C-alpha cells in the first residue's frame, strides 16, 4: 500500500484523540509532536513539516474545535483538511488547447519511468476520455528509447511518430505536431530525453523543444520512492522549464510518501497523476482528498466505486444478479465475476480502500495470492460445459482429469468445489432473507 509506514504512524497517533469528549491544548501539542516525527521519518521536507504542524496546531486549539460536541473528531478533520491542502487541495485536470492537438511534454531524469508513463498516459486519454493521442519518440540519446516507445505503441495499438535518432528533438517535435494537425489527433505526447543528472545541455535542449512545441502541459516524471531527491529534481526542472504538473511513479511501493507530501508545497506544482503498478492501465489521476483519507485510515470509497464502474459490465451484472436469485449461478458465472473483480486491480489494494481497513488487523495484513486465483481460473477452464453447469457430477475420476488438465492438484480442485458449494448455500440464504421484499438483494455498485 502507498504510504503504509506513514499511514500506520498517523493512524496510531490520531486514534488516541479520536474518541475524546474534551481535548486540551496539551493533548493537541502531544499529538502534533508525534505527527511531526512521523512526517520527518517519512522524508517530508523539514520546512513543509514545520508549516503543516503550525497550521494544524493553530486550527486545532481554536474555539470552533474546543467547544464542539466532538472535539476529538474535529481535530482529526483539521488534520485531514490540512493534509489534503498540502498535496494540492483539489484534483488538477489536464489543460486542453483551444485548437487541437493539445501538446504534453514529458520530462525527467533517466530511470524514473518517463517512456512507460507516456504510454500509460496515452492509454488513459484514449480509454477514459475517448481521445485520439499520438506518442512521439523525441529521446534520441538513450539506447533503445525509440524501440521501447514503439513496443508500447504496438501493445496499445497506438501510433508512434519517430524520425530515428539522427534528427534533432526540436525537428521531431515540429514535424510530429504538423502531422497531428493534418490527421486530427487530440493529443501529442512528447517523450523527451532524460539524463542521469540535471545539466545545462539537457535543459537547453528541453527549452528549445518547449519553444517550438508550445505545450499546454509540461509533466515531470519522478520516482516517488526517491523522496527528497524527487523534490529537488522537481525544483530544478520547475525553475528552468516552468512545470505544469508532476507524475509520481511507483507510488504503490512508496511506504513513506515524502515526495508526494512535499512536491506541491516546495514547487507549487500540482501532482497530476500517480503510477500504481507496471501494467499499462496503472496510471490514475491524483486526488489529494482521497489520498489524505487513505493515509488517515478513512478509506477511499469513491475510487473503489470508479474502479467497479469501469470494470463491471452493468448488463452482465444484472444478468448475474438474476441468476443468483434463481439459484442458476454456475462456475462459468463465477469465473466471469472473478475476472471483473481482478480487472479492478490487486485485491489487497482494493481491500485497503475500505473505510476502517487499517484498524482491522486481519484485513490489514491480508495477502492475496494472485497465483492461487490463476489456479482457480485454470481449474474451471479445464472442466466441460456440463461440469461447469452441474458440478455435482464431478466424481473422483473427473477430479483427477481436471487437476491434470489445469496443472494443479486434486486437493485444489476439491477445495474450489467445496468453496463454490458453500457460496451457493450462502446465496440461497440471502435469497430467502430477501423474500417478501420488493427489490431483494443487489450486487455491490448496482
UniProtKB/Swiss-Prot annotation:
Subcellular compartments: Cytoplasm
Gene Ontology annotations of biological process type: SRP-dependent cotranslational protein targeting to membrane
Keyword S-adenosyl-L-methionine applies: no
Keyword set, alphabetical order: Cytoplasm, GTP-binding, Hydrolase, Nucleotide-binding, Ribonucleoprotein, RNA-binding, Signal recognition particle
Top-level taxon of the source organism: Bacteria
Catalytic activities: GTP + H2O = GDP + phosphate + H(+)
Binding site for GTP: 108-115, 191-195, 249-252
Recorded GO MF terms: 7S RNA binding; ATP hydrolysis activity; GTP binding; GTPase activity
EC number of the protein: 3.6.5.4
EC class name: hydrolase
GO cellular component term, pick one: signal recognition particle
UniProt keyword annotation of Lipid metabolism present: no
Subunit note: Part of the signal recognition particle protein translocation system, which is composed of SRP and FtsY. Interacts with a small cytoplasmic RNA (sc-RNA).
Homology family: Belongs to the GTP-binding SRP family. SRP54 subfamily.
HAMAP family found in the cross-reference section: SRP54 (MF_00306)
Domain notes: Composed of three domains: the N-terminal N domain, which is responsible for interactions with the ribosome, the central G domain, which binds GTP, and the C-terminal M domain, which binds the RNA and the signal sequence of the RNC.
Reported function: Involved in targeting and insertion of nascent membrane proteins into the cytoplasmic membrane. Binds to the hydrophobic signal sequence of the ribosome-nascent chain (RNC) as it emerges from the ribosomes. The SRP-RNC complex is then targeted to the cytoplasmic membrane where it interacts with the SRP receptor FtsY. Interaction with FtsY leads to the transfer of the RNC complex to the Sec translocase for insertion into the membrane, the hydrolysis of GTP by both Ffh and FtsY, and the dissociation of the SRP-FtsY complex into the individual components.
Protein name: Signal recognition particle protein
Organism name: Bacillus subtilis (strain 168)
